[in-house]
């Protein structure tokens, strides 16, 4: 399996970088595994690998959070989309190495003391006699943060009136953080890397940055990582021809034009629309591409809920409360569970989600393939009759059992592709 799950996180990353006021789409591990969100099966590439080319390490971590935590808040989704589509996204204020050094400096474990001129002079004399790596870390960390704050303030001033809401919020956050605190003291101070602050100034701002306003600095860094994510997503959209702004709607309209599976080489694009009724049945022989089509549609819906570009020319997508799939189900020798039993349990599980009243997209690929054709036909018909009751959900079902499809060809709740 190909995996892009990051092995560790900075201790404070989740606390300061991942937002707490979002509402998220409901899903589960089986769905993420079926869609290869972070880990590919059968040598497939993970979906995350498409968007993992961020400029910073914490940008990667934020992108991982975005792609594994789809939203069901239409305004939050649109806010991300508009920022990614904005052609004048600013560059990052510092490069990856400089931002990594700031992270290291902020987490550096030493005794921070209140600034004192006498102590600064004494420590300066000591450093003439020996090489002090500790002092280098503090001096460079302070200097880089001063440079960062000045460049962020310039970014704020250059934000256009017609900029997307996400960028306006970024500019306002910079304004409130810097100019609403003692951090404003450094604006205009040592803008050039060549100029070096005095030892007392270093001690003063080290105390300010790591003791008094540690959380404010962390908050500003999170804004930079968010900008990194938006720039990376925009780069993917441009290079691959993805649609940045799928139209998110409160209705159940779901249609997509020119969609492809993002990892299908020289794949042929398709158009698809969820017609009247809540069930769409995809028919075709084995190896005809039904599973790939189901995955391609579901990946597009998933990415749209992440606020990320989708592999299509255009798309209209409902804001779902949940996405669930039954595609690659494992059996279990340990539990004595056959593939057929795994299918039954999974379908029961997703039906419980549909019964909850939430608006869900549910994907069922080749139901009951673990048994004979007659039993699979009868069981599929029984499940289909249940699905017709849940008009608040959309069901995409693939099958090569033509008798099953013919059984519902005149049913207004079902459509075929």
Predicted regions and their residues:
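Structural signal for well-ordered, non-membrane alpha-helices
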Residues: 85, 228, 348-351
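ATPase nucleotide-binding head domains, primarily ABC-like/P-loop NTPase cores
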Residues: 240-417
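Long amphipathic alpha-helical segments
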Residues: 155-161, 236-245
């Amino acid at each position: 399996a190909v995996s892009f799950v990051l092995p560790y996180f900075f201790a404070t990353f989740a606390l300061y970088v991942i937002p707490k006021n979002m509402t998220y789409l409901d899903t589960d591990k089986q769905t993420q595994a079926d869609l290869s969100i972070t880990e590919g099966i059968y040598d497939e590439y993970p979906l995350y690998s498409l968007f993992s080319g961020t400029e910073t390490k914490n940008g990667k971590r934020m992108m991982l959070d975005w792609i594994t935590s789809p939203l069901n808040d239409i305004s939050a989704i649109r806010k991300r989309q508009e920022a990614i589509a904005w052609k004048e996204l600013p560059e990052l204020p510092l490069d990856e190495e400089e931002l990594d050094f700031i992270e290291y400096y902020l987490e550096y474990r030493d005794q921070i003391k209140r600034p004192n001129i006498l102590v600064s002079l004494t420590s300066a004399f000591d450093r003439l006699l020996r090489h002090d790596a500790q002092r280098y870390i503090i001096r460079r960390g302070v200097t880089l943060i001063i440079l960062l704050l000045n460049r962020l303030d310039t970014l704020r001033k250059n934000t256009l009136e017609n900029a997307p809401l996400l960028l306006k919020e970024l500019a306002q956050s910079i304004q409130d953080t810097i100019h609403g605190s003692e951090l404003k003291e450094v604006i205009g101070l040592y803008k050039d890397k060549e100029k070096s602050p005095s030892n007392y100034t270093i001690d003063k701002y080290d105390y300010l940055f790591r003791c008094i306003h540690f959380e404010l600095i962390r908050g500003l860094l999170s804004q930079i990582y968010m900008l990194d994510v938006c720039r990376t997503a925009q780069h993917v959209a441009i290079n691959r021809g993805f649609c940045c702004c799928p139209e998110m709607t409160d209705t159940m309209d779901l249609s997509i034009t020119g969609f492809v599976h993002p990892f299908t080489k020289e794949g042929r694009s398709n158009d698809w629309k969820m017609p009247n009724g809540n069930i769409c049945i995809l028919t075709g022989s084995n190896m005809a591409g039904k599973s790939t089509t189901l995955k391609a549609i579901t990946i597009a819906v998933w990415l749209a809920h992440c606020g990320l570009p989708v592999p299509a020319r255009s798309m209209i997508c409902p804001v779902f409360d949940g996405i669930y799939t039954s595609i690659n189900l494992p059996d279990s020798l340990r539990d004595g569970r056959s593939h057929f039993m795994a299918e039954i349990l999974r379908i029961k599980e997703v039906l419980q989600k549909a019964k909850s009243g939430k608006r869900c997209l549910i994907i069922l690929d080749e139901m009951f393939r673990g048994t004979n054709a007659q039993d699979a036909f009868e069981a599929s018909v029984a499940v289909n009759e249940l699905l017709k009751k849940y008009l608040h959900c959309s069901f995409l079902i693939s099958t090569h059992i033509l008798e099953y499809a013919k059984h519902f060809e005149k049913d207004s709740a079902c459509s075929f592709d």
